[in-house]
Design a protein with these regions (language model features):
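C-terminal accessory nucleic-acid interaction domains of nucleic acid-metabolism proteins
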Residues: 1-77, 84-87, 91-92, 132-134, ...
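Polyanion/phosphate-binding surface patch
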Residues: 93-125
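Short beta-strand
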Residues: 98-100, 206-212, 253-257
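Portal/gating segments that form or line small-molecule/metal binding sites
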Residues: 186
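Active-site palm subdomain of RNA-directed nucleic acid polymerases
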Residues: 196-209
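Short, conserved phosphate-binding/catalytic loop or strand-edge motifs used
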Residues: 210-220
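Catalytic palm subdomain of template-directed nucleic-acid polymerases
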Residues: 219-231
C-alpha cells in the first residue's frame, strides 16, 4: 500500500493498493519505522503520494527553486509531511495562489479564481461579501488540494481570515511586522514581543509566525463573532496607536519612502478579501523557504525569519506543536478592547 499518513487512531489516509508481496509472510509485514522527515523528503515518495490522492504530477523532476535540489515531487512530499499541521489553517478558507510558471522566481503571479485545466482537487465557487457583491473563490479541502496546487507550480498559499461557510465573520487577525530593508532582526523580534504583550494586556493571546521572508506575523485566533469592519478598525487603530506612541520605531503607512529605519505594522491583511500567508506554506523566495509557526521562546533564539527551508520545516512539523492551544482559544474582540486602542 502507498499512503499519505496513518492517523492517531490507526486509520490509513489516501491509501492506494500497489500489489501483493509474494516475498514475505503476513506476519513479517509491519509498520514502517519513523525516520527524520526533514532529511528524507523523497521525490519518489512525493510522486507516489500525488498519484494516491488523484493528482498526476507533470514533470515531477522539474526544479522549482533555482540553485536548489527542490523539485515538484519534493514539494508534494513536503506538503504530505506537513498536511496535518497545515490543513486546519487552510481547509475551506478562500485563498490566493502565488504561481511561478517559469520556475525562476522572476515572474510570479497571484491567482484567486478558477482557470481552465486546474486540478479538480482545488475547489472553486462563489460567495457573497458583506457589501453584497459576489466573489469568485478558490479553496482546498485536503492534501489532494495542496498537491493540486503543487501541480500548478504554486509556491505560496495565502488565506482569508474567515471560513467560506461564514465569510462575514473572521476567525483570526494578523499583524504583519514588515521592517525597512537593513533593519536588524532583533528589532523585528522585539516588535513582535511588544505587540504580544500589549494584546495580552487587553485580553488577547497571540502566536508568532516567521514569514519565510524578513518579517514576523503575530496571529490572534478569534471566535467568529466580531465582523470584518470591527476587526479591521481594531487592527488599524492598534497600528496607528503604536505609530503615535513610538514614531521612531513604527509606522502605520505602507509608504516605503517613509519607512526608513522603522517597521511598518501592516494591518491591511484584516479586511474581507485580503489574505495573509498560510502557516506551513512555502514562499516564492530563493532557497525554498517556508512560513513556520514557532513558539515565543523559539523566536527569541532566531536570527532571521527565513531560517526554515522545506527540509527543516518538514522535520519541525513532526515535533511538538508550536501553536499548542491556538485552535482552542476562546477569545473575541470586545467593545472594550476596541475602545482601548481607539485614541
Amino acid at each position: 500500500m502507498a499512503y499519505a499518513e496513518i492517523t492517531p487512531d490507526g486509520s490509513v489516509r489516501h491509501a492506494s493498493f500497489q500489489g501483493m508481496r509474494a516475498d514475505k509472510k503476513a506476519s513479517q509485514v509491519v509498520l514502517e519505522t519513523l525516520v527524520d522527515v526533514g532529511s528524507a523528503l523523497d521525490p519518489a515518495t512525493g510522486n507516489e503520494i500525488a498519484g494516491a490522492v488523484g493528482v498526476k504530477l507533470s514533470h515531477p523532476d522539474k526544479t522549482m527553486y533555482p540553485n536548489t535540489p527542490i523539485t515538484k515531487a519534493h514539494l508534494a512530499a513536503y506538503y504530505a509531511a506537513v498536511a496535518n499541521r497545515m490543513l486546519p489553517h487552510i481547509k475551506d478558507r478562500p485563498l490566493s495562489l502565488v504561481r511561478d510558471t517559469d520556475n525562476d522566481l522572476q515572474k510570479t503571479f497571484f491567482q484567486k479564481h478558477a482557470l481552465p485545466g486546474m486540478p479538480r482537487t482545488l475547489k472553486s465557487g462563489q460567495l457573497t461579501k458583506i457589501k453584497g457583491t459576489e466573489s469568485r473563490i478558490l479553496w482546498i479541502e485536503d492534501l489532494a488540494g495542496l498537491i493540486g496546487g503543487v501541480q500548478m507550480n504554486t509556491l505560496e498559499f495565502h488565506v482569508w481570515g474567515s471560513d467560506r461557510h461564514t465569510p462575514d465573520l473572521p476567525e483570526r487577525l494578523v499583524f504583519d511586522i514588515d521592517p525597512d530593508e537593513g533593519l536588524d532582526f532583533e528589532h523585528v523580534k522585539q516588535a513582535a514581543v511588544d505587540i504580544r504583550d500589549i494584546l495580552g494586556a487587553i485580553g488577547l493571546q497571540s502566536w508568532p509566525l516567521v514569514s519565510g521572508g524578513k518579517g514576523v506575523h503575530v496571529v490572534v485566533p478569534l471566535l467568529p463573532e466580531a465582523d470584518w469592519i470591527a476587526v479591521k478598525d481594531f487592527c488599524r487603530d492598534f497600528a496607528e496607536l503604536l505609530a503615535k506612541t513610538e514614531p521612531q520605531r513604527f509606522i502605520a503607512n505602507m509608504s516605503k519612502a517613509r519607512r526608513k529605519g522603522r517597521i511598518f505594522l501592516d494591518y491591511l491583511r484584516n479586511g474581507q478579501g485580503s489574505t495573509a500567508i498560510c502557516p506551513w506554506s512555502t514562499r516564492a523566495r530563493a532557497g525554498g523557504t517556508v512560513a513556520v509557526p514557532v513558539t515565543w521562546e523559539e523566536l527569541d533564539g532566531m536570527d532571521r525569519a527565513n531560517c526554515f527551508d522545506i527540509f527543516a520545516a518538514a522535520a519541525k512539523a513532526q515535533g511538538p506543536d508550536a501553536w499548542e492551544g491556538y485552535f482552542q482559544a476562546q477569545q473575541t474582540l470586545t467593545d472594550q478592547m476596541q475602545a482601548v486602542v481607539k485614541r
